[in-house]
């Protein structure tokens, strides 16, 4: 099976990585689809995020990393995905994701959405939390892959040089 895992991944977290690794084991192939959303101001460009994900997943066979804009269902159809994969950290995630899953199903009735719960050790992680911790000089080494930590530290150290 081929799963599409869409998201902004700004930045990729260890929670994302855990989901990707588990999904490869379950489904065989995972297309990580990096959303290009011009209305948001990401910390990293789409190309930088793609490179971060490719570097972090290079030990996994069956992972493809792409960018997309527009509807997730169109991306899933274009890339021959059998399902859309979504991670859940809390009940509030489920309520939002279920609404999106129903919308996607109304647009492509043969496309399933599969929800995977995050592992407990990653349940607090979000890209926003990681950026906030990095912005104020906190340790993010346990939150993101090493190459992403380097990129974030470089980004925020250059944005806020010490006096």
Curated annotation (Swiss-Prot):
It catalyses: (R)-4'-phosphopantetheine + ATP + H(+) = 3'-dephospho-CoA + diphosphate. ATP binds at residues 8-9, 16, 87-89, 97, 122-128. Keywords: ATP-binding, Coenzyme A biosynthesis, Cytoplasm, Magnesium, Nucleotide-binding, Nucleotidyltransferase, Transferase. Its EC number is 2.7.7.3. Its main location: cytoplasm. GO terms for molecular function: ATP binding; pantetheine-phosphate adenylyltransferase activity. Substrate binds at residues 8, 40, 72, 86. Its cofactor is Mg(2+). It is found in: Cytoplasm. Pathway: Cofactor biosynthesis; coenzyme A biosynthesis; CoA from (R)-pantothenate: step 4/5. GO terms for biological process: coenzyme A biosynthetic process. The keyword Disulfide bond does not apply. Pfam families: CTP_transf_like. One of its GO terms (cellular component) is cytoplasm. It comes from the Bacteria. Belongs to the bacterial CoaD family. Homohexamer. Reversibly transfers an adenylyl group from ATP to 4'-phosphopantetheine, yielding dephospho-CoA (dPCoA) and pyrophosphate. This is Phosphopantetheine adenylyltransferase. The lineage of its organism: Bacteria, Bacillati, Cyanobacteriota, Cyanophyceae, Synechococcales.
């Amino acid at each position: 099976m081929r799963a599409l895992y869409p998201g902004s991944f700004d930045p990729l977290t260890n929670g994302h990585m855990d989901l990707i690794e588990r999904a490869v084991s379950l489904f065989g192939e995972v297309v990580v689809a990096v959303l290009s959303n011009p209305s948001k101001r990401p910390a990293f460009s789409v190309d930088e995020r793609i490179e971060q994900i490719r570097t972090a997943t290079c030990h996994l066979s069956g992972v493809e990393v792409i960018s997309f804009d527009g509807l997730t269902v169109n991306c899933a159809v274009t890339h021959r995905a059998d399902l859309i994969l979504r991670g859940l950290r809390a009940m509030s995630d489920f309520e939002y994701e279920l609404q999106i899953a129903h919308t996607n199903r109304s647009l492509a009735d043969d496309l399933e959405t599969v929800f995977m719960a995050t592992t407990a050790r990653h349940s607090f992680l979000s890209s926003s939390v990681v950026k906030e911790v990095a912005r104020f000089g906190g340790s993010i080494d346990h939150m993101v892959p090493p190459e992403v930590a380097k990129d974030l530290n470089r980004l925020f150290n250059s944005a806020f040089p010490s006096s």
